[in-house]
Amino acid sequence: MKPWLVCLVVLASWAQAAQATPPPSFQALVDATPIGGTLRPAPGIYAGPTTVNKPMTIDGGGKVTLDGGGTGSVLFLATSGATVRGLILQNTGQSHDRLDAAITISGDDNRVENNVITNSLFGIHLRQANRNLVKHNRISSKHAEASLRGDGIRIWNSVENRIEDNDINEVRDLTVMNSPRNRVTGNSIRNARYAMQFVFSPHALVENNSLSSNITGIVLLNSDSAIIRGNRISHSMETSSVGVAVKKSGEVIVEGNEIVHCAVGVLTDSPFNPEEKLILRNNRIAHNTTGMQFYGERGGHIIHGNSFEKNLSQVVVFGSGNATDNDWRGNYWDDYQGFDRNQDNIGDKPYELYAYADRIWMETPMARFFRNSPVLELLDFLERLAPFSAPDMLLRDQAPLFHRPK
């Protein structure tokens, strides 16, 4: 055999052997680390799954990859007081039933920070885990339609966790379920289904997040006493998209947010009890198809100091009732038709919003297809010019701002 042919055969054998060699086990390194110790593995790819069952620190320095091999979850944090940072975690299984996740946390007071999670069905799953910090992680799910992905972060039956400054892209949701007193702050979430949904999770703080190009921004369902503050929610423009939806939740504060370019800016239903109010103040609600939408409105909400700008419809009401029983005061309306003769920045007359031809598509769902069509626009013009019947008043703001808040 010619020498060059022998060399080719040898090289091919080496390449095949290298491909067939599985990555080393990460579990062995974890097991060899003492309680309270620090594991700094050599750069490279290691095989999961791995279970951490003692307080310790794992620091991958951004150069250590933990690969799940496409089966199950990758890293189980079944302890308290541990730190996991600087890892690249990838290739979970595909099971929604088993909640295959890059990191599953079932202990308290852990830190998970500065990790990269990719090609993982669920990103970080906290189950019966309290007072953990999840910070500065970059998370993406499997490449699939939004509803077929897993949650970027999922919190179940867990309290007082902090989810801070994470970059989350192309996941299904960030879900908080049966979990009170959690804080979700400073995160960026893009191209998800529900950027955040809270279900039976009272006393949540949602602050200073950037939510863009998601089907829906923030949803509260049966989650009382939440604070939604200082977030920017934009470009949720599908038919059913909403910036902030508050359903069956009372004593909720929505303040200082910017909600722009959404199908519906804010959606809410009526509180069960009069004392369970929605407080909406100092928000900018602009360039939405509908600024604010009520369903089954009975009043009781406090809506002060907001700026309603360039919305196709400022406020709409579906179902029974109207929005006049809410406390509207000091809001800026860009379609206000009045003066400010004493220059106190308060309009000389109240802002009043009426429904003319809009009543057709508000009361008849099938007619919503024709919303803002030339026919309905002409009918609306004629109704305003010479009403066929008394229009419905949707709201009255007794002290509208004359200039837009800065």
What positions do the PLM features span?
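Bacterial N-terminal signal peptides
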Residues: 5-13
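Extracellular beta-strand solenoids
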Residues: 41, 52, 60, 66-68, ...
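Extracellular beta-strand/beta-solenoid scaffold signature
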Residues: 68-76, 96-104, 119-126, 146-156, ...
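Acidic Gly/Asp/Thr-rich repetitive segments characteristic of extracellular carbohydrate-active
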Residues: 18-48
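Extracellular beta-strand-rich solenoid/capping regions of secreted or surface-exposed proteins
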Residues: 31, 46-59, 66-110, 121-128, ...
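Functionally critical loop-and-helix segments that line ligand-binding/catalytic clefts
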Residues: 239-243, 252, 266-269, 279-406
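Parallel beta-helix/beta-solenoid
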Residues: 34, 53-54, 61, 79-80, ...
